[in-house]
Amino acid sequence: MKIGIVTGIPGVGKTTVLSFADKILTEKGISHKIVNYGDYMLNTALKEGYVKSRDEIRKLQIEKQRELQALAARRIVEDLSLLGDEGIGLIDTHAVIRTPAGYLPGLPRHVIEVLSPKVIFLLEADPKIILERQKRDSSRARTDYSDTAVINEVIQFARYSAMASAVLVGASVKVVVNQEGDPSIAASEIINSLM
């Protein structure tokens, strides 16, 4: 099985790009599964009573976040292993999480070694476009990312973090630009890099 980790700042369009990737892989008849790392963490955090919503996860104490990361990684690999050798697993997550205590690596050693991806993708877009997308998405609380300078800083930390994680497992790192108006281009680039 080939695993690709698709990272990006909130509002870059990961969920949209991955929905296009799902459609393309289905049309090609390729066995695949797309999972959201945050969903796995959220389900555990809700069960344990740590949070009431997804956006509260990044505000938890660092130790709680690490515990949730490890549990999620193990569960994801269990689920993706059902795809068999020819399957493609795409994981929607973040390379870094901006917390009150500083930047938390989204793919630290205890996570990346379990997931062992072929490629870590950095989905990026112009910070002004990301800010516009965030404003249009009223379903999420992202006030801690509501400035282009902060968005630029997070993008840079994500690049550093992705490369550091890739070194641990021999994965490649690929920047994919999500152009406004056509997420299928980014989706195709991700798929082609895993084939």
Swiss-Prot record:
GO terms for cellular component: cytoplasm. InterPro entries: Adenylate_kinase_AdkA, P-loop_NTPase. ATP binds at residues 8-16. Its main location: cytoplasm. The keyword Zinc-finger does not apply. It is found in: Cytoplasm. SUPFAM superfamilies: P-loop containing nucleoside triphosphate hydrolases. Gene3D superfamilies: P-loop containing nucleotide triphosphate hydrolases (3.40.50.300). One of its GO terms (molecular function) is ATP binding. It catalyses: AMP + ATP = 2 ADP. Its EC number is 2.7.4.3. Keywords: ATP-binding, Cytoplasm, Kinase, Nucleotide-binding, Transferase. Belongs to the archaeal adenylate kinase family. NCBIfam families: PRK04040.1. Homotrimer. This is Adenylate kinase.
